[in-house]
């Protein structure tokens, strides 16, 4: 590791100190554009809020860096396609941060399945039940932590007043910056089902139903959702992923 970038100065100082405690000296940046000018950086890991993923990845490949970007790779489908275009144009590597894909045990199970040793698989179903606490409800704009450069935090997202109790992490549960647990957790179940089935392309038919139930809070993304899709070129097979956190 040669550098760390974070728009929260407190977080940045803390992580730099952790590196020092282990005998590692790193450069510290609050602006990713400055980080990408650093010639000592060959590869970057992007673990920002979702709304920053695409722009950070595209800037990185344009700067000649390879990229490991946390899931979801992008905030929406269009952004994801732009990342692919940029990576191909600049001949850089962009890897999606899906830790399940790096599990040797899971990879062996996928191979076992694809070899037909369980017969023809007609349906794959992924389930996750994980209760999350309400993020609360506020009556108006909240103060942004003093250590945060809010302009840089918002980046490509609209710069709007903070309308929830907590800036960090709870960005997952509002649409301008997050995707809810569809992109935070359900993506693992959907990806595993597609991997197991060996899907070569996007599904021609997808049905998703859900909503935000149980809480009256400042969250806007679903906390309960079901996704059903038919794998491409296989109308007789289907995969399903269901997420519930209520």
Predicted regions and their residues:
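N-terminal glycine-/serine-/threonine-rich beta1-alpha1-beta2 phosphate-ribose binding loop
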Residues: 1-69, 75-93
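Secondary-structure transition/capping motifs at alpha-helix termini
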Residues: 24, 64, 86-92, 115-119, ...
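Rossmann-like dinucleotide-binding domain that binds NAD(P)(H)
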Residues: 151-237
């Amino acid at each position: 590791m040669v550098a760390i970038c974070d728009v929260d100065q407190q977080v940045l100082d803390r992580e730099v100190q952790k590196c020092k405690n282990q005998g590692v000296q790193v450069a510290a940046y609050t602006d990713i554009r400055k980080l990408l000018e650093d010639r000592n950086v060959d590869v970057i890991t992007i673990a920002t809020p979702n709304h920053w993923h695409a722009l950070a990845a595209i800037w990185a490949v344009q700067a000649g860096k390879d990229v490991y970007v946390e899931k979801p790779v992008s905030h929406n489908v269009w952004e994801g396609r732009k990342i692919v275009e940029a990576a191909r144009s600049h001949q850089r590597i962009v890897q999606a941060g899906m830790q399940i894909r790096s599990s040797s045990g899971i990879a062996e199970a996928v191979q076992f399945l694809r070899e037909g040793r369980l017969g023809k698989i007609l349906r794959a179903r992924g389930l996750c039940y994980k209760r999350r606490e309400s993020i609360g409800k506020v009556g108006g704009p909240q103060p942004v932590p003093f250590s945060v450069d809010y302009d840089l935090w918002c980046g490509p997202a609209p710069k709007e007043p903070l309308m929830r109790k907590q800036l960090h992490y709870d960005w997952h549960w509002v649409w301008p910056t997050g995707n809810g647990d569809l992109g935070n957790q359900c993506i693992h179940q959907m990806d595993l089902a597609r991997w197991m089935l060996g899907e070569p392309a996007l599904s021609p038919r997808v049905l998703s139903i859900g909503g935000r139930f149980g809480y009256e809070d400042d969250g806007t993304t679903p906390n309960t959702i079901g996704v059903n899709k038919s794998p491409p070129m296989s109308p007789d097979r289907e995969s399903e992923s269901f997420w519930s956190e209520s």
